[in-house]
């Protein structure tokens, strides 16, 4: 089944911008349980070296970043590229596709850029 939702009227509900937010809303409307999102324990990354960055706008309350090194593959897996295509996005490269995939899943805008 393909379900197309025009989400333009829900701009005051950023929790609905991602697939998980929409699924949570449907689960509530249908009075059905929602499968929890698989979350990786991020404690394994707490000892990574800090990235030198500065938040210049006091209205920005948080900025998260990390570096990814030694990438040997530049193309996203086919299933990810297909899902992006069905969501109206074109595949670009592994890191850009990964951030777009996560944005669609969680509704959290992300961007990958070259640290150099």
Over which residues does each language-model region extend?
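RNA/tRNA-interacting regions in translation and RNA-turnover enzymes
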Residues: 1-116
């Amino acid at each position: 089944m393909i379900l197309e939702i025009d989400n333009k009227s829900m701009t005051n509900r950023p929790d609905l911008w991602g697939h998980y937010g929409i699924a949570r809303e449907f689960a509530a409307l249908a009075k059905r349980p929602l499968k929890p999102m698989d979350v990786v324990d991020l404690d394994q990354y707490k000892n990574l070296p800090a990235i030198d960055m500065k938040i210049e706008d006091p209205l920005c309350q948080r900025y998260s970043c990390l570096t990814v090194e030694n990438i040997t593959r530049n193309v996203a897996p086919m299933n990810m590229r297909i899902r992006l295509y069905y969501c109206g996005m074109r595949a670009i490269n592994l890191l850009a596709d990964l951030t777009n995939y996560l944005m669609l899943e969680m509704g959290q805008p992300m961007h990958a850029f070259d640290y150099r």
